[in-house]
UniProtKB/Swiss-Prot annotation:
Regulation affecting activity: Mycophenolic acid (MPA) is a non-competitive inhibitor that prevents formation of the closed enzyme conformation by binding to the same site as the amobile flap. In contrast, mizoribine monophosphate (MZP) is a competitive inhibitor that induces the closed conformation. MPA is a potent inhibitor of mammalian IMPDHs but a poor inhibitor of the bacterial enzymes. MZP is a more potent inhibitor of bacterial IMPDH.
GO molecular function: IMP dehydrogenase activity; metal ion binding; nucleotide binding
Biological processes, Gene Ontology terms: GMP biosynthetic process; GTP biosynthetic process
The protein's name in its UniProt record: Inosine-5'-monophosphate dehydrogenase
InterPro entries in the cross-refs: Aldolase_TIM, CBS_dom, CBS_dom_sf, IMP_DH, IMP_DH/GMP_Rdtase_CS, IMP_DH_GMPRt
UniProt EC number: 1.1.1.205
Binding site residues for K(+): G295, G297, C300, E464, S465, H466
Enzymatic reactions: IMP + NAD(+) + H2O = XMP + NADH + H(+)
Enzyme class: oxidoreductase
Residues noted as binding IMP in the record, renumbered to the chain: S298, D333, G334, G335, G356, S357, Y380, R381, G382, M383, G384, E410
Membership in a protein family: Belongs to the IMPDH/GMPR family.
Entry's transmembrane regions: none
Cofactor(s) of this protein: K(+)
Organismal lineage: Bacteria, Pseudomonadati, Campylobacterota, Epsilonproteobacteria, Campylobacterales
Length: 481
């Protein structure tokens, strides 16, 4: 029998407090998603079909993190989810949605409803701006067969030149009391659009995680051999791809990673792995970040069904030891129950954490809402559950094409308590991490990693750590018992 090491998880260890002059409110939580993409907070929503679609991804990016849209949908639907995130707000919309004057109001309604926008520029066949159709133009129109050109606000319009700053645009929009400012070139060809909503959101969400064009960042999951899906997602503007597998240290994953890096210019996160060798091989194949975790998730049964995995603290430690030599970020995926677990993962060297169950219960998650015994819940399932595998994630567990009655699941379906908005949950998690860094005297995540010291605790120590000897009469928003 070969016992490689004693393996620990989050509840097995505690960090030792250090002398500190650092206040929690003063720490920086800026980190990295990949070697090229920054995060303003080290939180990622999981690529699960009950956790992340466009609503969760938008909420995460506005707060400074990022969401990874799951792949249990056809390519076109996943591309639409990415597009909704990228179109949700922008400093300057460089490829604005537009409509032609000969289209009907019914056509315009489809566009505005689909993209959740209140107006759309109108152009001719040469792309010249000839008007704008807004809510005010159509509010009292009952005949949707009318042509857009008959109802729109026609030229001359207040427009701006290419290269105008957001501050200049804001002044211009306030001066003329308009909500949309088309950007045109010297020939009056539509080149962009600035909306007052985007300017207001820049003030409301100062830490929003945005790309170079002022759009919210978003990632998307893909499977083995899905190069066509990857290409379409990159064209849609996805910021990072997550090559997602229950066993990231496999020949098919390595081959797919190499093919993507050869053919596309995009950062690729690869996982899941738990060993030094796997981390080294994925980095050699071109991985821009390593996702760590086999079996730590609350809905995952891989360790029980397959007898395979590694407790998450030791897994993170293994992978960071190798990845840090190449300056490749590590993402701790799974096993996070409390904000203290996040702090421990970061102190071990992870650059960010991926969260599933804590976000599955939020308003923005795509899971079903339900009431059970008078309490509110949302559905949550593992991507290795029968339900998720029949919807498209069977390839993640190397069972693609297997009949549903022959699937061997590595996850379950369940429910989690309803927890309000994503922002409420992230607020508590961020606050807990800030508190931890204050105890550690760490001004930033790098200092936390460099200086943190751990002790291994006993089962009695764990019992002492939790609430004990008292009945909770009022639940705390960050402690779940």
């Amino acid at each position: 029998m070969r016992i490689l090491q004693r393996a620990l998880t989050f509840e097995d260890v505690l960090m030792v407090p250090r002398k500190s002059s650092v206040l929690p409110k003063d720490v920086s939580l800026k980190s990295r998603l990949t070697k090229n993409i920054r995060l303003n907070i080290p939180f990622i929503s999981a690529a699960m079909d009950t956790v992340t679609e466009h609503k969760t991804a938008i909420a995460m990016a506005r707060l400074g993190g990022i969401g990874i849209v799951h792949k249990n949908m056809d390519i076109q639907t996943q591309v639409k989810e990415i597009t909704k995130v990228k179109k949700s707000e922008s400093g300057v919309i460089n490829d604005p949605i537009f409509i032609h004057a000969h289209r009907t109001l019914a056509d315009a309604k489809v566009i505005t409803d689909n993209y959740k926008i209140s107006g759309v520029p109108v152009v001719d066949d040469k792309g010249l701006l000839i008007g704008i159709l807004t809510n005010r133009d159509v509010r009292f129109e009952t005949d949707l067969s009318k042509k857009v050109g008959d109802v729109m606000t026609k030229m001359p319009l207040v427009t701006a030149h290419v290269g105008i700053s957001l501050d200049e645009a804001s002044d211009l929009m306030h001066k003329h009391k308009i909500e949309k400012l088309p950007i045109v070139d010297k020939d009056n060809v539509l080149k962009g659009l600035i909306t007052i909503k985007d300017i207001q959101k820049r003030i409301e969400y100062p830490e929003a995680n945005k790309d170079d064009f002022g759009r919210l960042r978003v990632g998307a999951a893909i499977g083995v051999g899905q190069l066509d899906r990857a290409e379409m997602l990159v064209k849609a503007g996805v910021d990072a791809l997550v090559l997602d597998s229950a066993h990231g240290h496999s020949a098919n994953i390595l081959h797919t990673l190499e093919e993507i890096k050869k053919s596309l210019v995009v950062d690729v996160i690869v996982g899941n792995v738990v060993t030094k060798e796997a981390t080294s091989d994925l980095i050699s194949a071109g991985a821009d970040a390593i996702k760590v975790g086999i079996g730590p998730g609350s809905i995952c049964t891989t360790r029980i069904v397959a007898g395979v995995g590694m407790p998450q603290v030791s897994a993170i430690d293994n992978c960071v030891e190798v990845a840090s030599k190449f300056d490749i970020p590590v993402i701790a995926d799974g096993g996070i129950r409390y904000s203290g677990d996040v702090a421990k993962a970061l102190a071990l060297g992870a650059s960010s954490v991926m969260i599933g169950s804590l976000l599955a219960g939020t308003e923005e998650s795509p899971g079903d809402f339900m009431i059970y015994q008078g309490r509110q819940y949302k559905s949550y399932r593992g991507m290795g559950s029968i339900g998720a595998m029949t919807k498209g994630s069977s390839d993640r567990y190397f069972q693609e094409g297997v009949a549903s009655e022959k699937l061997v699941p590595e996850g379950i379906e369940g429910r989690v308590p309803y927890r309000g908005k994503v922002s409420d949950m992230i607020f508590q998690l961020v606050g807990g991490v800030r508190s931890s860094m204050g105890y550690q005297g760490a001004k930033n995540i790098l200092e936390l990693y460099q200086n943190a010291e751990f002790v291994e605790i006993t089962s009695a120590g764990l019992k002492e750590s939790h609430v004990h000897g008292v009945d909770i009469t009022k639940e705390a928003p960050n402690y779940y018992g």
